Amino acid sequence: MILEFESHLRDRGETPEGMLWIPGGRFRMGSEDFYPEESPVHEVSVPGFWMDRYEVTNAQFERFVAASGYETLAERPLNPADFPGAPEENLKPGSMLFGKTGRAVDLKNYTNWWVWAPGTNWRHPRGPRSSLEGLELHPVVHIAYEDAEAYARWSDKELPNEAQWEYAARGGLDGKKFTWGDEEFPDGKAMANSWQGEFPWQNLLRDGYEGTSPVGSFPANGYGLFDMAGNVWEWTSDWYVARRGNEVKACCSPEMSPRVATAEQSYDPGQQQFRIPRKVVKGGSHLCAPNYCLRYRPAARQPQMIDTGMSHIGFRCISSQPAPAGLHTR
């Protein structure tokens, strides 16, 4: 579905509302210490850009929908041809919803905690009978890739590529495990909305939240950006490949904010029946736990089918608008 939206961004040269300037520079992208898809570490050069200070909220997305009449993918019926053999119930409009289990389960089978929930979408984020009451400042969820793109176009912005996102998330702390340093709980303090305890059945709520949290509830990183770790995963514009292999240069030869792979390369080899491209999502979420998904780190990356929104995936935007005159852009 292609829609044309009227841009309402300010005149060029002004500071984009709600955004921060991320000065360009070089950094070491990736990690060798956690999951194989994060390697190899390689040096990347990223020009400066603007980035949303916060993840896009329900209130912001509601204004977009009111102005544009946009309907998200989760609100539209599914095409049976795209899902051969799927039960009729699963073809109704809906989204993937997390369900906490009552006991320890097989962590290799995600269907133990993810269910297709008809009637669930961004307006009803916790199931078909839920609402946005009290969630206005929480990140919008159940957003497929094209939904995030549509919002970005309407805002005269775009989605970050993976290198831009990771560079911004690090906040100037090159090579650190987390967006705030190497210690997960400095001085015993929770720095992000993640899962403490045994996923997916025991959440100790050390950070104070069972699900998503209002944006900005945890400390900002070195660039002043909030929730670059945890809360919700965030879409990037890059197609997913199971890390770079020989597609990247050596660490001593920096790339310019690389975009690699094609849609065809991003298909899931383990699900040949679904020829659905996948994008990279970054940042981890409130469902990430050390025993299952220690991915609330800047180097972490996951594939996500572009047609699927979930209760732990949102986004933020960037802008290539020039920096204000006199601002140090290095």
Positions of PLM-derived features:
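Short, structured beta-strand segments at or near domain termini in extracellular proteins/domains
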Residues: 311-325
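Short capping motifs at secondary-structure boundaries
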Residues: 49, 64-73, 155-156, 323
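Acidic-aromatic/histidine active-site loop/patch
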Residues: 57
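Short, P/G- and charge-enriched loop/turn segments at secondary-structure junctions
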Residues: 7-9, 36-41, 108-110, 267-269, ...
